[in-house]
């Protein structure tokens, strides 16, 4: 029996321990610091100012485009009116028409008093 006691002394008690892994320290974030709040506020203000500026520029562009379209429409109407008036001037300035009206008014055609004017 003495052998049994001797053997137990030779082999120390083996305790099975799990390998301990170092615990990862989880950082808990508290409230934001004053510096972070200032930076976020400034960044947000810049974003809002840029967004407002973009919207206002787009509104100005829209207004200018509307004015341009209105002016172009007026120009086209005026050009059409000018063309109609040119046709009317040519029609009213015909030699036969002028001669007819002159005869109705009692005027006579005298070749010595006629001057030829080069029209445009």
Swiss-Prot record:
InterPro entries: Cell_div_FtsL, FtsL/DivIC. GO terms for cellular component: cell division site; plasma membrane. Its main location: membrane. It is a single-pass type II membrane protein. One of its GO terms (biological process) is FtsZ-dependent cytokinesis. The keyword Heme does not apply. Residues 1-37 are cytoplasmic. Residues 59-120 are extracellular. Residues 1-22 are annotated as: Disordered. Residues 13-22 have a biased composition (Basic and acidic residues). Keywords: Cell cycle, Cell division, Cell membrane, Membrane, Transmembrane, Transmembrane helix. The chain crosses the membrane at residues 38-58. It is found in: Cell membrane. It comes from the Bacteria. Essential cell division protein. Belongs to the FtsL family. This is Cell division protein FtsL. The gene is ftsL.
């Amino acid at each position: 029996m003495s052998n049994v006691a001797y053997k137990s002394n030779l082999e120390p008690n083996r305790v099975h321990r799990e390998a301990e892994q170092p615990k990862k320290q989880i950082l808990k974030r508290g409230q934001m610091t004053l510096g972070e709040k200032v930076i976020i506020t400034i960044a947000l203000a810049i974003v809002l100012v840029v967004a407002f500026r973009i919207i206002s520029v787009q509104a100005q562009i829209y207004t200018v485009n509307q004015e341009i379209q209105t002016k172009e429409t007026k120009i086209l109407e005026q050009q059409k009116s000018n063309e109609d008036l040119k046709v009317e001037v040519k029609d009213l300035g015909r030699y036969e028409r002028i001669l007819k009206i002159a005869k109705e008014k009692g005027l006579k055609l005298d070749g010595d008093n006629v001057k030829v004017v080069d029209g445009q």
